[in-house]
Amino acid sequence: MAHPEFQVSTGKDDKFYFNLTAKNGLVILSSQGYKEKDGCKTGIASVKKNSSNKRHYERKDSKGGQYYFVLKAANSKVIGKSQMYKTNESSENGIDSIKSNARRAKINYMK
């Protein structure tokens, strides 16, 4: 993969999900399930709009001692969740990756 992209797929529950992948192909943000494809598209547009604003990221610690974050829209609803990171620094690097990749990421509908 030579460019970042939003990979949209349908889950076993027939809902639509997206994963934002970086240039290296690693997933850096995952969505909730959407009942409709248009809802998923709206979620992607919200990620593109809100990803550059550091106030929209909420940093969290897991019970297992790992770090992750959620990206929130202006209305405070969660629009994406990161993977788990072993260090806080790695988590911050994940945020930086989303900031630099989300706006230019293309949408790829998976089969």
Label each residue range with its predicted role.
Residues 99-111:
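Glycine-rich beta-strand-turn "strand-cap" elements at beta-sheet edges
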Residues 40, 91:
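Alpha-helical recognition helix of canonical C2H2 zinc-finger domains
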Residues 1, 48-53:
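Short secondary-structure junctions
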Residues 1-4, 104:
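Charged, low-complexity amphipathic helices and coil/IDR segments
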Residues 52-54, 64, 102-105:
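Short, intrinsically disordered/low-complexity patches at protein termini
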Residues 6-9, 15-23, 28-34, 43-47, ...:
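A structural feature that tracks compact, well-ordered secondary-structure segments
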